[in-house]
Structures are given as structure tokens and as C-alpha cells.
């Protein structure tokens, strides 16, 4: 275990639809599926990414015909929108201003973000995404709401 460090985090939201824009231009849009906000930490490795991808694609959080959350994103042929969000790695222990020193350096974080998208595309038919490091406007219609927070060190 990497002592004292936050590891890759993802916030999953079941959505009826979601989209992301950069400078007013649509960069990603999905119908029913998952919106994933992804935060990459400094010490993240491929194993962390693989654990998060597996949960995102296989977690049974969609309703079956009986209304029970029993189906995965893959089972329902859901769509996926991935948005980078380093603020998930905020450390708010001291003072009133969050620290982001545990977030991955931008080059490494972008590589991991792109790899996350690539691996998801192998498992999910439609994967859309935002622009790494950009100021984005995200619109979504939550379904539920149903929100899950994943931390790779806890998987």
C-alpha cells in the first residue's frame, strides 16, 4: 500500500443523458448510462486504472425488469461519458483552502485519463469524453439519483 496517498478516484452517476462542452463546443454527449468524473493521483498505476474500469463497466447499478439494481453498464448497453476532475483529490485537512498536491502531475494524469478512455472503449460500445485540463461545462439528468464513489485503494 502506498502510505498516506489518495489513489485514483471516480464518481459514477447514473444518468438519463449527459453532455460536456468546452468553450461552447460540444465535446461529448450520451444517452442513458454513466457519467464518470475521474481523478488521477500522483502514485496511480495501471492496476489502479484496471480496478476502476472493471467496476465502472461491471458494477450492477442499473435496474432490471423487476426494478432491482441487478444489471451492469455492459448488460444494459449503456453509454459512458468520462470527465477528468483533479479536484476529487482535494485534501481539506488543513485550513480553508483545499490542497491538490496529491493529484497526479498533468502529463501523467492525462496519460492515465487517455488510457482509461481507451480501455473503457474495449468494453463499452459508446464512450464519450471531455477535454483533459479544460474548463468544462457538464450537463446531466441524474436517474435516481444514483451516485457511487470509487477509490482504487478500497477495491
Report residues per predicted region:
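Short beta-strand segments
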Residues: 13, 39, 84, 139, ...
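A short beta-strand-loop-alpha-helix capping motif that often carries His-Thr
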Residues: 70-87, 133-143
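N-terminal intrinsically disordered, cationic/polar leader segments
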Residues: 14-21, 28, 40
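Compact, glycine-rich, soluble single-domain proteins
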Residues: 26-77, 88-118, 128
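Short, Lys/Arg-enriched N-terminal segments with co-localized hydrophobic residues
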Residues: 1-7
